[in-house]
From Swiss-Prot:
<dbReference type="GO" id="GO:0003924">
    <property type="term" value="F:GTPase activity"/>
</dbReference>
<feature type="domain" description="Obg">
    <location>
        <begin position="2"/>
        <end position="160"/>
    </location>
</feature>
<comment type="function">
    <text>An essential GTPase which binds GTP, GDP and possibly (p)ppGpp with moderate affinity, with high nucleotide exchange rates and a fairly low GTP hydrolysis rate. Plays a role in control of the cell cycle, stress response, ribosome biogenesis and in those bacteria that undergo differentiation, in morphogenesis control.</text>
</comment>
<keyword id="KW-0479">Metal-binding</keyword>
<dbReference type="InterPro" id="IPR006074">
    <property type="entry name" value="GTP1-OBG_CS"/>
</dbReference>
<dbReference type="InterPro" id="IPR027417">
    <property type="entry name" value="P-loop_NTPase"/>
</dbReference>
<feature type="binding site">
    <location>
        <begin position="284"/>
        <end position="287"/>
    </location>
    <ligand>
        <name>GTP</name>
    </ligand>
</feature>
<dbReference type="InterPro" id="IPR015349">
    <property type="entry name" value="OCT_dom"/>
</dbReference>
<dbReference type="Pfam" id="PF01926">
    <property type="entry name" value="MMR_HSR1"/>
</dbReference>
<keyword id="KW-0547">Nucleotide-binding</keyword>
<feature type="binding site">
    <location>
        <begin position="167"/>
        <end position="174"/>
    </location>
    <ligand>
        <name>GTP</name>
    </ligand>
</feature>
<keyword id="KW-0963">Cytoplasm</keyword>
<dbReference type="InterPro" id="IPR036346">
    <property type="entry name" value="GTP-bd_prot_GTP1/OBG_C_sf"/>
</dbReference>
<keyword id="KW-0342">GTP-binding</keyword>
<dbReference type="InterPro" id="IPR006073">
    <property type="entry name" value="GTP-bd"/>
</dbReference>
<dbReference type="GO" id="GO:0005737">
    <property type="term" value="C:cytoplasm"/>
</dbReference>
<dbReference type="InterPro" id="IPR045086">
    <property type="entry name" value="OBG_GTPase"/>
</dbReference>
Length: 434
């Protein structure tokens, strides 16, 4: 069985756009041909695809960096460079994607085949055919391709189960799953047998079905990370219905009502109150001698608290009460689905592109880092420099004019820059000239 991994950190880098071309027409009867440099191709984007065949983020445990290809450079005769292929990465249905540095939610993949563009490829640089003017009919200017987006992401998997089995360790959750589905969880008579969630499909004789997850046993303090704790409570978030199993084994040394309240409190104290989910109370392990007496005390305690919800008595060993529990669970799942559909119609976008918050236009800072050294920082300015082809004098002069229009020269003077001082914008260093 593959290792269950439900959290991971990865880095994704989309492809750079291809560089624009500086070229001119050279034809037999056109001795002074105009510009003919084509545009670069778009860089490859990185796209997550929800795959129902995956159950874990294990594929990302040993490979943490993913890079898409760059676009092809522009060509002569005004030909465009070829766009790079997008890089598709399969993730399990139920994967939530966050920006690792900011914690911002980027997207949630909840349907098979749903796509999420997490890093967009850079656009291709323009060739010199775009820069011809009446004054400069033969421009030696072309843009470099735009850098692709580079992000560090945190992936979280929250199982998409209709029903979640919760309760203390060794209350019979795995056994119930094994007798109602084809899932084969590890079962033994000691605590924390289930170390990873198990998922199975319950199919009833009347044709109804629902998915059910056996979640690792909870103990007091789970919502704060005690035991297997908070790392598995997240899997309860997506469930429609909770089956709350309470052991009627008189030999476990615990009061059933206390077990019930402990688990309810942990669900309530989770970051999103899980105790409000619809639940069925299940008295498990009713085949054990003395279980009837413990059940009577449990029902009495619930009634005294004003809780008149039915208690389902089951034994997964003898199958007593299991059929009725599964039928009533299916009915409750249908009720919850109907309620949700009425509250908010389900609309799932097939492909979604996350739009990262753009910096304020032309926002930059100037810092004096040495006696004659200055550093200019600003995401858009640095991108402008990266897209400037510095191999041609026309390109350098165009960049200088744009920096001046954006107020960089004035800002440098205000910081004390004089002729001959070094100024760095990203990796580009130039000499300041007033």
């Amino acid at each position: 069985m593959p290792t269950f991994v439900d959290q991971t950190k990865i880095e994704v880098q989309a492809g750079k756009g291809g560089d624009g071309m500086v070229a001119f027409r050279h034809e037999k009867y056109v001795p002074n041909g105009g510009p003919a440099g084509g545009d670069g191709g778009r860089g490859g984007s990185i796209i997550f695809v929800a795959d129902s065949g995956l159950r874990t983020l294990m594929d990302f445990r040993y490979r943490r960096k993913f890079k898409a290809d760059s676009g092809e450079n522009g060509r002569i005769k005004s030909q465009y460079g070829r766009a790079a292929k997008d890089l598709y990465l399969k993730v399990p249905v139920g994967t939530t994607v966050y920006d690792f540095n900011t914690g911002e939610l980027i997207g949630d993949l909840v349907e098979k085949g749903q796509e999420l563009v997490v890093a967009k490829g850079g656009r291709g640089g323009r060739g010199n055919i775009h820069f011809a003017t009446s004054v400069n009919t033969a421009p030696e200017i072309a843009e470099n391709g735009e850098p692709g987006e580079d992000r560090v992401l945190r992936l979280e998997l929250k199982l998409l189960a209709d029903v979640g089995l919760v309760g203390f360790p060794s209350v019979g959750k795995s056994t119930l799953l094994s007798v109602t589905t084809k899932a084969k969880p590890k079962i033994a008579a000691y605590e924390f047998t289930t170390l990873t969630p198990n998922l199975g499909m319950v199919i009833l004789p009347d044709g109804r079905d629902f998915s059910m997850a056996d979640l690792p046993g909870l103990i007091e303090g789970a919502s704060q990370g005690v035991g297997l704790g908070i790392q598995f409570l997240r899997h309860v978030e997506r469930t429609k219905v909770i089956l709350h199993l309470v052991s009627m084994d008189p030999n476990n040394g615990r009061e059933a009502i206390e077990d019930y309240h402990t688990i309810k409190n942990e669900l309530k104290n989770y970051e999103t109150d899980l105790s409000k989910k619809r639940e069925l109370i299940v008295a498990s392990q009713m085949d054990i001698s003395g279980a009837e007496e413990k059940l009577a005390a449990f029902k009495k305690a619930l009634k005294e608290e004003g809780n008149n919800e039915p208690v389902y008595e089951i034994s997964s060993v003898t199958h007593k009460g299991v059929s009725k529990l599964m039928n009533d669970t299916a009915t409750l799942v249908e009720e919850v689905e109907k309620e949700r559909a009425e509250e908010e119609p389900k609309v799932v976008q097939k492909t979604k592109e996350y739009k990262y918050k753009a910096p304020q236009k032309n926002e930059f800072t100037v810092e004096k880092v040495g006696e004659h050294e200055f550093v200019v920082k600003g995401e858009q300015l640095e991108r402008l420099v990266q897209m400037t082809n510095l191999d041609h004098q026309d390109g350098i002069m165009r960049l200088a004019r744009r920096l001046k229009r954006l107020g960089v020269d004035d800002a440098l003077r205000e910081k004390g820059a004089v002729n001959g001082d070094d100024v760095a914008i990203g990796k580009f260093v130039f000499e300041f000239v007033q």
